[in-house]
């Protein structure tokens, strides 16, 4: 192992001079910073036996002349079933105070995307058990889903329900990468996962592995933590043949960290001050998220849109990779409908009769048409009232309100707060229920019967119970 000495430190960027052979680009170097092990990743060869590196932790306390050792390999992180229920950081160290993550294997975080010949070309729907998602914006196995939403509309609850349902319905594991998110939120998520049974702190049975690089971390760690999480997910796909769910919260912070590092490395910025390698960085991450002949990684990525500007290069670059978008709306959350998914704004590439079938496609489009008509009639209703509408429009509004309520659903992970048991609805029941409402088979039932139920049969039962209670 060749050794070198630090010659310059500028924030997160450290220059190291080697006497012997230069370490390769993207390989890891190690040095001591007080009692801590500091990992540096080689980013550039400067000539004159020097390399420029990015630090994965704070550089306070380092000084020129400190000794650095080349490891001869990229950053290696623990992978395998032992990571489930644990929290690790960008370099694979545990941050949950439960001791070392003892795994049989360690994998490098920089890996090539699967060969084209190994990728599966079949498009298959990943049934989530959440009605609004499965019907109107279905997820593809091995697809990439963008989750858009402001603060407090239920992104985290939706993510936890997806983790829970995939574990129940498919027996699959999930990996959660917290990229530049609030430490408090990361802590809350961990404890909520314990409360909802997704993570079992004592003993086996955990369904998720957590990889965190929070806002307080230096940009080097935030720019690499998504790759660490992805490597953990790739193990489950490639070695265990699993259908893995991979969550990134927030993909914008990955770009933001790349832009901070880029400036320190002396690259000339491109549009809006972002790094010139923006599309390449994003592509390297996204191309590894795919379905192979062994298993799949389906990723759900929370996307922060700076100043609500969808043309900003950071969100615009991630759009090119998405198969589906799930938009959470504050207006829907305000009327008490959870999950607060906007049925008209959310889209999916696989909502196509050749993939989902004619019946599913027809019902989804009919539901959207009724909701769109209701939306355009709302101004008239607000000004003139319902009585001024034609009989046909009154019927459409009544059905739309039932559909709107039927798109809500009690979640397993929210049982502790709501008191109502969670429901996982299969795709067939979802299509059948919405088709029946669109056809007017349940025009006689009150709209309240459709709120927070699973299948259409439960809505009928609820209506009967309401009628009995009213008669009593």
From Swiss-Prot:
CDD domains: ATP-synt_F1_beta_C, ATP-synt_F1_beta_N, F1-ATPase_beta_CD. One of its GO terms (cellular component) is plasma membrane. It comes from Pelagibacter ubique (strain HTCC1062). ATP binds at residues 149-156. The gene is atpD. SUPFAM superfamilies: C-terminal domain of alpha and beta subunits of F1 ATP synthase (SSF47917), N-terminal domain of alpha and beta subunits of F1 ATP synthase (SSF50615), P-loop containing nucleoside triphosphate hydrolases (SSF52540). Its main location: membrane. F-type ATPases have 2 components, CF(1) - the catalytic core - and CF(0) - the membrane proton channel. CF(1) has five subunits: alpha(3), beta(3), gamma(1), delta(1), epsilon(1). CF(0) has three main subunits: a(1), b(2) and c(9-12). The alpha and beta chains form an alternating ring which encloses part of the gamma chain. CF(1) is attached to CF(0) by a central stalk formed by the gamma and epsilon chains, while a peripheral stalk is formed by the delta and b chains. The keyword Phosphoprotein does not apply. It catalyses: ATP + H2O + 4 H(+)(in) = ADP + phosphate + 5 H(+)(out). This is ATP synthase subunit beta. Belongs to the ATPase alpha/beta chains family. Produces ATP from ADP in the presence of a proton gradient across the membrane. The catalytic sites are hosted primarily by the beta subunits. PROSITE patterns: ATPASE_ALPHA_BETA (PS00152). It is a peripheral membrane protein. One of its GO terms (molecular function) is ATP binding. Its EC number is 7.1.2.2. Keywords: ATP synthesis, ATP-binding, Cell inner membrane, Cell membrane, CF(1), Hydrogen ion transport, Ion transport, Membrane, Nucleotide-binding, Translocase, Transport. It is found in: Cell inner membrane.
């Amino acid at each position: 192992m060749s050794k070198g000495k630090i010659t310059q430190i500028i924030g997160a960027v450290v220059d190291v001079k080697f006497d012997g052979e230069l370490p390769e680009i993207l390989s890891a170097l190690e040095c001591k910073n007080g009692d801590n092990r500091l990992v540096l990743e080689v980013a550039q060869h400067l000539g004159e036996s020097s390399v420029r590196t990015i630090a994965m932790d704070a550089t306070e306390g380092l000084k020129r002349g400190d000794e650095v050792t080349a490891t001869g390999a990229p950053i290696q992180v623990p992978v395998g079933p032992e990571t489930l229920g644990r929290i690790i950081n960008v370099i694979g160290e545990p941050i949950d105070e439960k001791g070392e993550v003892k795994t049989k294997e360690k994998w490098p975080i920089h890996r090539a995307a699967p060969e084209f010949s190994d990728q599966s070309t079949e498009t298959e729907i990943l049934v989530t058990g959440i009605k609004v998602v499965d019907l109107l914006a279905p997820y593809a196995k091995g697809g990439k889903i963008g989750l858009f939403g402001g603060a407090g509309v239920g992104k985290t609850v939706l993510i936890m329900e997806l983790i829970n349902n995939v574990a129940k319905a498919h027996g699959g594991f999930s990996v959660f990468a917290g990229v530049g998110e609030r430490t408090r939120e990361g802590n809350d998520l961990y404890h909520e996962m314990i409360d909802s049974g997704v993570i079992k702190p004592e003993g086996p049975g955990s369904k998720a592995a957590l990889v965190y690089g929070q806002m307080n971390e230096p940009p080097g760690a935030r720019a690499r933590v998504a790759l660490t999480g992805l490597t953990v997910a790739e193990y489950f796909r490639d070695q265990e043949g699993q259908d893995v769910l991979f969550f990134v919260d927030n993909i914008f912070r990955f770009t933001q960290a790349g832009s901070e590092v880029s400036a320190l490395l002396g690259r000339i910025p491109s549009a809006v001050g972002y790094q010139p390698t923006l599309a390449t960085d994003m592509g390297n991450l996204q191309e590894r998220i795919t379905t192979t002949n062994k298993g799949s990684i389906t990723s759900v990525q929370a996307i922060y849109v700076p100043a609500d500007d969808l043309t900003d290069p950071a969100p615009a670059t991630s759009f090119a990779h998405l198969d589906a978008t799930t938009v959470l709306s504050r207006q829907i959350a305000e009327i008490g409908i959870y999950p607060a998914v906007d049925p008209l704004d959310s889209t999916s590439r696989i909502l196509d009769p050749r993939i989902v079938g004619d019946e599913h496609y027809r019902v989804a489009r009919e539901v959207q048409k009724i909701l769109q008509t209701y939306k355009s009639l709302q101004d008239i209703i607000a000004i003139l009232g319902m009585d001024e509408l034609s009989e046909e429009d009154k019927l459409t509004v009544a059905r739309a309100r039932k559909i709107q309520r039927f798109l809500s659903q009690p979640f397993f992970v929210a049982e502790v707060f709501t008191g109502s048991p969670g429901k996982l609805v299969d795709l067939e029941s979802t299509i059948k229920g919405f088709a029946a409402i669109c056809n007017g088979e349940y025009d006689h039932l009150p709209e309240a019967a459709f709120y927070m139920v699973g299948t259409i049969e439960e809505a009928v039962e609820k209506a009967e119970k309401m009628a009995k209670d009213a008669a009593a």
